[in-house]
Regions:
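Phosphate-group recognition and catalysis centered on beta-loop-alpha active-site segments
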Residues: 4-243
Length: 243
């Protein structure tokens, strides 16, 4: 084997590595092709990631924790320490852009729902931000009606891994979801892609918000495609690690 062939082979390997590396960090994955307008960036909890996400997505998701003592919505996931980034500052950083925002409010419940609604209304009014571009998500759906009436989109963050439950336990969970949706028919439901088939079967007409952040590129390919094609699925969150 000549030196030129060896160098040629090394060049191909290096190029392949760079292509795979670039694909890993690209939001334009093959399994999402044809539906890029339907995907959003998951956990955009910093201004740097926000700036880069806005160049690649029409929708973003972020985590919020409300502090009633200071009347502040803090942008962070409870598994990570707060960086001091407030939602007011976050929205100001959008400039004139108005992406669809999926707000996972970690501690929204009946004790603080009215305060959170007032805070959100204040922030969005100042920016003249359209409420129909905002999804309010919580594990405690009892007060979501307040946000629905105010003009926001809303979603009940379901218990995870329904597909792992025994039939009796699954039945109990499904009945609870049905009760919520009967009393609040405009509320959507949100969960990870693993439970999509269950939601499709039992809640075929309900608006769904799904995240695909741990899917297999091969074994889950068909499932992800079916999720994206489903007209009742409003948005799919995907992993995004900007360079």
């Amino acid at each position: 084997m000549t030196t030129s062939r060896i160098l040629w082979g090394i060049g191909i390997v290096v190029a392949g590595i760079f292509l795979l590396w670039g694909y890993k960090y690209s939001p334009r994955k093959i399994e999402f092709s044809g539906h890029y307008k339907k995907i959003g960036a998951h956990r955009v909890n910093s201004l740097d990631k926000l700036k880069k996400s806005l160049s690649n997505f029409d929708a973003i998701e972020l985590d919020l924790v409300f502090d009633p003592e200071t009347n502040v919505l803090d942008v962070h996931h409870p598994t990570a320490p707060s960086t001091g980034l407030t939602f007011t500052r976050y929205v100001a950083a959008l400039g004139d852009k108005q992406p669809f925002m999926w707000l996972d409010i970690k501690n929204l419940d009946k004790s603080n729902a009215k305060l959170i609604l007032q805070k959100l209304n204040s922030v969005f009014l100042e920016k003249n931000y359209p409420k129909q571009n905002v999804l309010i998500e919580t594990r405690f759906p009892e007060k979501l009606g307040l946000f629905t009436k105010a003009g926001y989109k809303t979603s009940y963050y379901l218990k995870q891994d329904l597909y792992k439950l025994k039939q009796t336990d699954l039945h109990t969970e499904l009945e609870q979801i049905k009760t919520i949706l009967e009393t609040q028919p405009k509320v959507g439901i949100s969960t990870e892609h693993f439970d999509y088939e269950i939601l499709k079967e039992y809640f075929p007409e309900t608006t769904k918000y799904i995240w695909c952040i741990r899917h297999s590129k091969i074994s889950d390919y068909t499932l992800v495609r079916n999720i994206l094609k489903d007209e009742t699925v409003a948005l799919v969150l995907v992993t995004y690690h900007p360079l």
